[in-house]
């Protein structure tokens, strides 16, 4: 397992809770242009390369900082 993981699913669930609504990958795609297949990889921590443009769009959508989204876990 890579020591770099993302917290996309957790932060998305927090946003859903705060806004009291379910947010689909289609909703995110409509607002960000990020493919639903890419969002699925983020949600399941199967991202192999972290693209700066994708990170920027996710951070804007989720209203978070890159350091909130991607973390390094020491083994």
Task: For every predicted segment, state its role.
Residues 1-27:
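A short, Lys/Arg-rich alpha-helix, primarily the initiator
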Residues 6, 51-53:
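Short alpha-helical elements of helix-turn-helix
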Residues 20, 47-50, 61:
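Helix-turn-helix/winged-helix DNA-binding modules
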Residues 20-41:
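Short alpha-helical DNA-recognition segment
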Residues 39-40, 44-49:
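Short, charged early-sequence alpha-helical segments and their helix-coil boundaries
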Residues 41, 70-75:
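Short, charged recognition helix plus adjacent turn
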Residues 53-68:
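DNA major-groove recognition helix of helix-turn-helix/homeodomain DNA-binding modules
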């Amino acid at each position: 397992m890579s020591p770099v993981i993302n917290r996309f699913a957790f932060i998305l669930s927090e946003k859903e809770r705060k806004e009291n609504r379910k947010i689909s990958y289609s909703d995110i795609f409509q607002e960000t242009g990020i493919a639903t297949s890419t969002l699925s990889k983020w949600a399941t921590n199967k991202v192999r390369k972290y693209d700066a443009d994708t990170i920027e769009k996710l951070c804007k959508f989720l209203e978070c900082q890159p350091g909130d989204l991607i973390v390094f876990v020491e083994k």
